[in-house]
Amino acid sequence: MRYPVILAMACLLIIQACKKNDEVNIDLKYDQNLSLEYHEVIDAYSQLANHYAEARLVEMGKTDIGKPLHLFMISGDRDFNPESVRDKGKCIILINNGIHPGEPEGIDASIQFAWDLLRNKNDLKKYLDNVMIGIIPVYNIGGALDRSQYYRTNQNGPIYNGRRRNARNLDLNRDFAKQETKNARSFAKTFLFLNPDVFLDTHTTNGSDHQYTITLIATLHSKLDPGMGTFFKNLMLPELYERMEKNSEYGMIPYVQMSNYLGNIKDGIIAYNDDPFYSTGYTSLFNCYSFMTENLVYKYFPDRVRSVVDFLTQLTAFTYDNCSEIRQLKDEADNKIKEQNTFTLDWELDMSYSENLLFKGYEYIRPEPSEGRRMRGYYDHDKPWADTIPYYTLYNPVLTVTKPWAYVIPQAWSDVVDKLKYNGIEVYRLKRDTGIEVETYYIENTERSERPNQGHYVNRNVKVSIVNQEMPYYKGDYVVITNQHANKYIVEMLEPHAPNSYFAWNYFDPILESHDFYSFRSFESQLMELLEKDEDLRAAMEERKIEDESFASDQMAQLRFLYENSPMYEIEKYNRLYPVARLISQPVNFELEEDTDTVFDSE
C-alpha cells in the first residue's frame, strides 16, 4: 500500500497547488477610478509571491518614512539570483512605480501585468523563458501614505492620489545623482543587485493636451555607447512605437515637450534631455536601456492604467525577441567603457536638425483678452487634427573631459566616497603618507540658483582652472581608479564643472570660503617692508600702477597685490581648491589597498 499512498499524496499536493493558484484574487480597483493604497499594493504582491513559485517579494532597504523598499521578482525557472540568470543569457527588466504617488497608474498596471504574466494570460508566460522581471511596487512610500482627493486636482482620476514629494519634502526623481534619501540609496542597492538591461519608470504628465493616452521619454541615444545607441534609435524605439500602434488601442507618441513653450504643438516637440538626477538619466549611465512612460493627465484613469499594461507587455515582448542582441551590446558597452577616455558632461539641443513625426492633436484656441484680463488658451476636442510636425532629437556635446587614470579623494570627504560606494564603485586607500604630483582644479567662478532646489542652492556654470602640483596625501586617503564599468558615473559625479556633479549639489562648498587673511592695520608695515626688500615685487607694483589708474589710487588693492605676490600667500593655496585631484597616470611604487568597508550595513 506504500506506493499508492505516496501517489495519492502527490496527486493531492498537485491538486492543492493548482487550487492554490486558482484562489488568487487580486482586488484591483482601477476600473472604479481608484488606485490601491500602499498596504493593498504590498498585500497584492504578497499574494502573488505566496501562490506562484515563479514569484518572490523581498525587502531591499529602508526608505525615509521608515518602511522597507520592496522588490517583486518574476523568474520562469524560479532562479532569483540575477548573476545566475545573466549567466544563462537571459535579460532583466526593472520597473519602478510610484516615484510620484500622485501619478499612480504604473502602480496598478504593474500588479495587473505581473498577475497576467504569472497566470499565463494570453500566453504571456512564454516571455519568462529568457526574461526576468523586477518590480518596485511603490518607490515613494512616504508620498503614497499621504493620500488626498485634492492632490493632482486637474487629473482625470483616480479619486484619491498620493503626495508628489517624500517624507523629507524631496522630489525623488531629482535625487538619483546626489542620493540624499534612503529611498535613493535603496534603489541603488536594488539596481546593483539586478543589473538590469532595461529600465522603466512610470509617470503622468500634466502638459499639453492631445489625442494620446500614453507618451514615452527614452534616454538620449547619443548618451549611450555607440553600439547600444544605434540599436536603441534604429530598432528598439521604432519597434516599440509600432508594437503599441498595432497591439494596443491607445498607440503611443514621444513625450510632448514643445519647442516654443507657447502651446503650439505644430511648431514641433523636442526630445527630453534626461539628466543624471532623473531615474532614466541615472540608469543609462550604467549602460541600461531606459524609459519613462508619461500618461496624459486628462485621460481617464482606467485607460491610463490599461495603456501602461499594454506598454509593459510590448516592452517585455521586444526584450524577449531581442534578448541576445540586447545582452551582447550591454556586455560590450560595459567592457568598452572601462577603456573609454573622453566623456561628455553636458549637451545642447541642435535646432537645425529635426525628424518628421506624425502627430494627432487638438486645435489650440487662444481667446481674445476680455476687459483687460488675459484669457487662458485651451485645446478644442471638437477640432482634432493629424499632421506631420518637427521632432528635434539631436543633442550635441558642449562640454567634454578626458578621464584621469584615477581620482584621489582626501579621507576628510568620506561622505562623498560613501556615495560612490552606494553605486558599486570600487575604492582603494593609500597604504602610507606620500606626496603625489596631481592635476588639480581651482574653482574660478560659480553661479548659485536663486531659489532652493531639493534643499540646495545649486552651483551652475562652474568655471575652473587647472594647476599641476604636488599635494600631500595621507594613509587612508581614497583612490578611485577609472577602469570600471561605472566610469560614466564616476566622471560625471567627480568633475566639478559637470552640471550634476557632487560639487554642483554643494557637497564641496566649504572650499569656497576663505578664513586665513591679514589684518589691515597690523599687516601694512610688514607688507611695506617686504616691498622695500624685493626689487622685482616693487617693479611689478609700479608697472601695475601705470597700467591701472584705479589700482594706483586704491591702497587696499595695493596691499592685496603685495599679499598675493608674497610668500605669505602660500596659506591661500587651499582656497577654492577642489579637493578631488586627478592622477593622470599611475605613479611608480604606488601602494594601495582595497577598501572593504561597506555602506549598506548602516542603512
Question: PLM features: what roles do these ranges have?
Answer:
Residues 3, 18-603:
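Structured catalytic-domain cores with a bias toward divalent-metal coordination
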Residues 4-8:
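Alpha-helical transmembrane segments
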Residues 10-17:
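Hydrophobic h-region of N-terminal signal peptides that target proteins for export
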